[in-house]
UniProtKB/Swiss-Prot annotation:
Gene Ontology CC entries for this record: nucleoid
Taxonomic placement: Bacteria, Pseudomonadati, Pseudomonadota, Alphaproteobacteria, Rickettsiales
Function: Plays an important role in DNA replication, recombination and repair. Binds to ssDNA and to an array of partner proteins to recruit them to their sites of action during DNA metabolism.
SUPFAM superfamilies reported in the protein's UniProt record: Nucleic acid-binding proteins
Protein name in the entry: Single-stranded DNA-binding protein
Subunit structure: Homotetramer.
Important for interaction with partner proteins, short sequence motif: residues: 147-152
Domain SSB stretches: 5-111
Annotated GO MF terms: single-stranded DNA binding
Length: 152
């Protein structure tokens, strides 16, 4: 196989107000929790069932950070595109822990506010704000340079 794909697309609701942090270099990073809910009808009881999955989202893109800072609060409905990343860290007792997050970088990431309600605008849930970095295309890509070997 010549390539792979790491892409996550989610539509869900923000579980709490986004957490904004600033790095030592002054760069802002946002952490938020996004809930997606599946619903189905139980075959035996005909009862409506649902299951909510919580996703950790980390936003590094300066443009997306700016939009989230201004418009996103607990309950906001978002469409996001990003990639999955797992990071390793040590807790206070020195034990290794792993966290998998949906990461929005400066490239291949998108965020759309699906139900933006701003008191200064009369959107009534019909408008949305979108911020997307333009994708670059390399029209002179040479497929003969691809390494077809399995990496393990």
């Amino acid at each position: 196989m010549a390539g792979s794909l790491n892409k996550v697309i989610l539509i869900g609701n923000v579980g709490r107000d986004p957490e904004i942090r600033t790095t030592g270099e002054g760069k802002k990073i946002i952490n938020l929790s996004l809930a997606t809910t599946e619903t189905w009808k139980d075959r035996i009881t005909s009862e409506r069932k649902e299951r909510t999955e919580w996703h950790r989202v980390v936003i590094f893109s300066e443009g997306l950070v700016s939009i989230v800072e201004r418009y996103v609060t607990k309950g906001s409905k978002l469409y996001i595109e990003g990639s999955l990343q797992t990071r390793k860290w040590n807790d206070n007792s020195g034990q290794e822990k792993y966290t998998t997050e949906v990461v929005l970088q400066n490239f291949n990431s998108q965020l759309i506010l699906l139900d933006h309600k701003n008191s200064n605008q009369n959107t009534q849930g019909s408008g949305h704000h979108e911020y997307k970095y333009p994708e670059t295309k390399n029209h002179s890509f040479d497929h003969s340079d691809l390494d077809d070997e399995i990496p393990f």
